[in-house]
Amino acid sequence: SQALPKKAMGAFSHWSNPNIGGIDDRTKKQFVMYDLSLAGYGGRYGEDGPEALSPVMNCTNIPIEVHESLNPIRINCLELLQDSGGAGLWRGGCGLRKDIELLNSKAVLSHLADRHKFPPYGVFNGKAGRLAETLLIRGNEKKVLSSKGVEDLQEGDILSFRPSGAGG
């Protein structure tokens, strides 16, 4: 960043790809919902970081209608996480929260994410983005999930994916 300060940018939010799978109660066939959690890019010289993008080229947001028509789930929330990007002269882009409710009797979550412990750094006095968080909401209980792992799910469970914002 010192050699080419006008080319440096704050750290990207993070990568997260939750997978939910099982036997669909409606069809008795296997299903796998593979998702991409979209997040922000870091602030860079002259502009704020873009919001809700994938770090992988040629990948875009999978429409809610596609997920809901192919899988026994419902998307209850899809919104930018306001102020999740790091502050700075040019702020980091925000992450995109997604809450997924399981409509099936059971399923399994395989979760792989980052930035749950170490926030995306800022550059040139820009601040770090907010830490990522993944919640399992079962009834009135909220359980914070680790960034990597496998979790058994039951009908009515809500998974809340809250990616970090990028560095400013």
Model-derived features: where do they sit?
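Glycine/proline-enriched, intrinsically flexible loops and inter-domain linkers
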Residues: S1-G168
